[in-house]
Amino acid sequence: MLTTDAVLTVLRPVQDPELQKSLVELNMIRDVAIAGGTVSFTLVLTTPACPLREFIVEDCEKAVKTLPGVEKVEVKVTAETPQQKSLPDRQSVGQVKNIIAISSGKGGVGKSTVAVNVAVALAQTGAAVGLLDADIYGPNAPTMLGLSGAAVQVQNSPQGEVLEPVFNHGIKMVSMGFLIDPDQPVIWRGPMLNGIIRQFLYQVNWGALDYLIVDMPPGTGDAQLTLTQSVPMAGAVIVTTPQTVSLLDARRGLKMFQQMGVNVLGIVENMSYFIPPDLPDRQYDLFGSGGGEKASKELNVPLLGCVPLEIGLREGGDKGVPIVVSQPESASAKALTAIAKQIAGKVSMAALV
């Protein structure tokens, strides 16, 4: 006779491939029901962006079908993103579970392009995602998300004024670009910069978010210090190109996060090679090759992926439609989506270990 205990017993050896722990022990198997020869249950993953979802479901189905009398297995898949561990000297941001910095050692490496597309790719999996544009002196994210003319609404609350984030392509966002004229330069010293970043963290109605992606300014200055010293960080991602000078600066940025006690989730090599639109089967190493992989090995951090340079990637940023939306089957979009899923998996693993 089929019983719930019997189902859980055969599922107990099935492990989360990344956590290397039993799904049953992790409470990822819930709501087991038996109706004749049909066994159904809910599989609760640690992230909607789980890259190994199909493999886990397949392992569960195979395990349950070993029981005598089982004719059909129905698996409902949901996700509960774990909350990043809190720190006594850091202030959490409302209902935001995980804060992830996308950073670079120097400008011009496509950091904002990566941040925007990773945020949208995570939202496409069903996650609740926000994007904080912390590049105060050069806020480009509004343009890349098609929000150049948007305005932030201000609401009054018992805690003071609260900004309402702008929404597009499935994500919430705030940016200095919403608060100034397009041609207006931001000429601020450190204390003012720190103040606006803290306002974007604590005085924005973010609501419940699985991930808050922070598009950092280049370098290792006040903005990085403010973020890492204010909130518990789920991790940081370093964006570079294969070029030697870019890699040198990326190393400095990476070590800065490590010195601040922030987990570096990995390196993204952007502009890895160029794919000409008239010869899509060809690729040209405009900025060299192998730099990201070499830095990954030398610094002992993962290489999350390599993003090629395509015309569609640039056009998507200019038109305000990220390439993961406009051309999801392109090489760049596939690379960025895979990177987003890797980031989500590493963040969940760090929160549960």
Curated annotation (Swiss-Prot):
Q: Which GO terms describe its molecular function?
A: 4 iron, 4 sulfur cluster binding; ATP binding; ATP hydrolysis activity; ATP-dependent FeS chaperone activity; metal ion binding
Q: Which residues bind ATP?
A: 105-112
A single BP term in Gene Ontology: iron-sulfur cluster assembly
Instruction: Show the SUPFAM superfamilies listed in the entry.
Output: Fe-S cluster assembly (FSCA) domain-like, P-loop containing nucleoside triphosphate hydrolases
Residues spanning the membrane: none
Q: Which UniProt keywords apply?
A: ATP-binding, Hydrolase, Iron, Iron-sulfur, Metal-binding, Nucleotide-binding
User: Which InterPro entries is this protein grouped with?
Assistant: FSCA_dom_sf, MIP18-like, Mrp-like_CS, Mrp/NBP35_ATP-bd, NUBPL-like, P-loop_NTPase, YlxH/NBP35
Give the protein's biological function.
Binds and transfers iron-sulfur (Fe-S) clusters to target apoproteins. Can hydrolyze ATP.
Q: How is the subunit organization of this protein annotated in UniProt? A: Homodimer.
Q: Which family does it belong to?
A: In the N-terminal section; belongs to the MIP18 family. In the C-terminal section; belongs to the Mrp/NBP35 ATP-binding proteins family.
* Entry-linked HAMAP family: Mrp_NBP35
Q: What is this protein called?
A: Iron-sulfur cluster carrier protein
Provenance organism: Synechocystis sp. (strain ATCC 27184 / PCC 6803 / Kazusa)
Gene designation: mrp
